[in-house]
Amino acid sequence: MNIKSLTKIALAMLVGLAAATAQAAQTYLPFTLASNDAGTTAAKLDGTKKALTDNGFEVAGEYSPYAGAYVIVVTNDELKKAAASHSRGGYVAAQRISLTEMDGKVQVSYTNPVYMSYAYRVNSKLAQTSAALKKALGYVQDFGPSEGMDAEDLNEYHYTFGMEYFDEPLELASKGSHDAMVAEIEKNLGAKRSGAAQVYKIDIPGTSQTLFGVSMKAPNEGKKYMDETFIMGEIDFKPLRSTAHLPYEILVKGKEAEALHARFRIAVNFPDLAMMGDNSFMNIMPTPDAIRDVLTSVAGGKSQDDDF
């Protein structure tokens, strides 16, 4: 083999190595900032919803979790198809968009579909959804922690030793059928049991999965650790707000109801949240159990012992 051939082989190997390294290095952040312009949520809300529906999205629900914040939840055919790809894929059916007032401007942001797809082990690029969101709302930057995670890290994500993975959900309750479980949740959310209320409901075609969005407001100070306003006040403190973390979910699969454990659900959206100190997990230590108790009550299940 002559020098020229060896040079070509070496060059090809280097190009292949560079391509593999670039692919392996692709990382994702949990949120996307679409715009940050002067104005108010009231002035921008209708236009935001119209832009979403004009680009193929169906508004599944909306609400204001607290003053200065508004969340719109949408879905589309691509998201529902991805949700149907495995028995617990329903979580990816809901795409959350937030409008947050900060310093005279409104941050319009949304959950990064690709990030959530890998976190929920659906593993779809959701190209149509990502493109439609950018077309409808715009694009400034992705945001969240200082460093993103790649697909493998997201598939196997947990915050630290002893913290739950995606496949370690809360088993809330079981009824005689899927319809009975759905009806129980709808009844209890309608009654605002334990301070919870329904934000949206999405049925996943071709499956026995139904996803509920659940808002949570503490009925009194003693229940503050389940309250969205309290929780977000502790964990969502950066200049770019992550309001689209909300709301939490209950997934009905077959005749059973489950929810992502809050130690996963919070951490996957705030992976750089400190364990101790100001604005840390320590400040919301009772929150995972408090959320579990609310969602269990909504599903008609029995309360469990605290994890800590």
Name each model-derived stretch:
Residues 207-308:
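A cross-kingdom marker for long, charged
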Residues 97-98, 199-201, 246-252:
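Short, surface-exposed beta-strand/loop micro-motifs that present aromatic residues
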